[in-house]
């Protein structure tokens, strides 16, 4: 018969093992929110922090600038401006509560972030309610806010970097929504009228097209009572407008020259990429970082200049973009080396050192973003926006990428058309590219080649004298 002491020790060991196994599970699920849904379809995520004096409200509306009408880019951004048009409202959040209120419009979504004091929760929700349900779309207010956005766009100096980024997007996508700036242009915003904004408000700003996250020192019971009362009346849409558009036409393969005065030249290359929900998205991120490192190694002069490669992913397939600041003397060589890097990614597997460096850099950057107080809800909000089956552990997905994944995705992306743009002074750029690459100058009508006409024969004069 076993002694009680030995049985007690054995039981203690079992309990300890269970505790050790359960610990990572608890750590993984402790950050998961409590979920609720109002009768109008508004999805709720609760991240309680008992005793925290602050509260963060993050409302994600799953429609963005991709739905701007043709020739009216900036329409959804302008609608975002109209949600909280009174400067006193913004001052209240910054001055009175030491927080902030902002509206961010991307191609895929409109996100309202409100940071304030937990004891002012009811008032914060009331401000949100007024912006969503009682949006002031009077002719006078629309004119005032539209003029303010146009002035902001005109007064904001567009750097050569932004010119190149916009040009490569337009070159790759043409008239497709991702080819125009989400913030709009002065000319396009001026075309947006009140009827456009009212229609966009009715189509997209609906309760069942949104998810609200509450993070901080507010109990779920208190929050539910307030949300039912103030956001319960928010109108539900009969049908969610799907993100479907006619596919863009094949892009022009000639290098586009954009005339921009300045001492440097901005070089861009791009290919059609993957969507945010694509299982290859994390692989494309690592692929981009490996591409950047190979380009830097092939062109030592880039080490002292801004250089990047990135995978831009949206609800629909985005773009794989490489870019650097070069000179008109080195632009042809830099373009050639970038193309060689693209070829090498399809034929030469990434080394273990390349993979480790890329994954470590990306993981560190992502960790820095996710540790911000108002970023706790982002994986769950993204899951709704991009129709993911579950919130993604992006760091774990990055770390699982291997060399064969990189080569497979490189062949998937780069077997399609790769486009290029150079932004700088056009005269030296034309001289630099002449004889190396076919090019087109933006806004310049190509001079037609002279026609080869046979020489005119002299008339035969048979008139008698």
Regions found by a protein language model. Name each.
Residues 95-200, 246, 340, 355-374:
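Acidic/histidine-enriched segments that form metal/cofactor-coordinating
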Residues 148-167, 246-264, 301-302, 348-399:
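Short acidic/His-enriched helical or mixed secondary-structure segments at domain edges of catalytic enzymes
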Residues 28, 211-216, 248, 357-465:
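C-terminal regions of mature proteins
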Residues 11-23:
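Bacterial N-terminal signal peptides
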Residues 58-118, 158, 180-181, 290-306, ...:
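M16/MPP (pitrilysin/insulinase) zinc-metallopeptidase core fold and M16-derived inactive scaffolds
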Residues 174, 182, 207, 211-275, ...:
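An aromatic/glycine/proline-enriched structural segment found at the starts
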Residues 85-86, 115-147, 311-369, 445-450, ...:
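M16/insulysin-pitrilysin zinc metalloprotease superfamily fold
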Residues 1-14:
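Bacterial N-terminal signal peptides that target proteins for export
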């Amino acid at each position: 018969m076993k002694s009680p002491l030995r049985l007690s020790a054995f039981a203690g060991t079992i309990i300890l093992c269970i505790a050790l196994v359960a610990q990572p599970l608890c750590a993984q699920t402790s950050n998961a929110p409590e979920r609720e849904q109002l009768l109008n379809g508004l999805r709720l995520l609760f991240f309680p922090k008992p005793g925290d004096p602050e509260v963060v409200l993050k409302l994600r509306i799953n429609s963005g600038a991709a739905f701007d009408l043709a020739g009216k880019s900036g329409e959804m951004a302008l609608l975002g401006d109209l949600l909280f048009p009174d400067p006193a409202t913004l001052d209240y959040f910054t001055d009175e509560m030491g927080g902030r209120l902002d509206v961010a419009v991307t191609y895929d979504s409109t996100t309202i972030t409100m940071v304030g004091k937990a004891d002012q929760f009811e008032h914060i929700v009331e401000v949100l309610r007024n912006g969503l349900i009682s949006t002031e779309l009077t002719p006078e207010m629309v004119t005032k806010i539209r003029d303010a956005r146009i002035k902001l766009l005109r007064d904001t100096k567009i750097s050569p970097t932004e010119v190149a980024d916009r040009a490569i997007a337009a070159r790759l996508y043409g008239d497709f929504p991702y080819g125009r700036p989400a913030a709009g242009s002065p000319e396009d915003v001026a075309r947006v009228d009140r009827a456009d904004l009212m229609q966009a408000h009715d189509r997209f700003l609906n309760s069942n097209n949104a998810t609200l996250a509450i993070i901080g020192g507010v109990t779920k019971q208190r929050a539910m009572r307030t949300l039912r009362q103030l956001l319960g009346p928010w109108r539900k849409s009969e049908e969610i407008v799907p993100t479907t558009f006619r596919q863009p036409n094949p892009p022009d393969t000639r290098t586009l020259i954009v005339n921009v005065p300045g001492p440097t030249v901005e070089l861009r290359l791009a290919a059609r990429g993957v969507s945010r929900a694509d299982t290859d998205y994390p692989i494309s991120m690592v692929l981009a970082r490996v591409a950047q490192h190979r380009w830097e190694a092939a062109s030592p002069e880039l080490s002292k200049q801004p250089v990047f490669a990135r995978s831009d992913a949206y609800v629909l397939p985005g773009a794989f973009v490489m870019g650097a600041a070069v000179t008109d003397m080195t632009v042809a060589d830099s373009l050639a080396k970038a193309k060689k890097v693209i070829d090498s990614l399809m034929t030469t597997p990434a080394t273990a050192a390349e993979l480790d460096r890329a994954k470590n850099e990306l993981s560190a950057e992502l960790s820095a973003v996710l540790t911000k107080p108002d970023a706790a809800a982002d994986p769950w909000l993204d899951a709704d926006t991009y129709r993911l089956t579950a919130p993604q552990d992006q760091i774990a997905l990055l770390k699982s990428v291997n060399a064969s994944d990189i080569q497979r995705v490189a062949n998937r992306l780069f077997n399609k058309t790769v486009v290029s743009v150079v932004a700088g002074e056009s005269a030296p750029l034309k001289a630099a590219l002449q004889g190396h690459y076919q090019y087109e100058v933006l806004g310049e009508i190509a001079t037609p080649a002279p026609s080869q006409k046979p020489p005119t024969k002299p008339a035969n004069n048979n008139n008698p004298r």
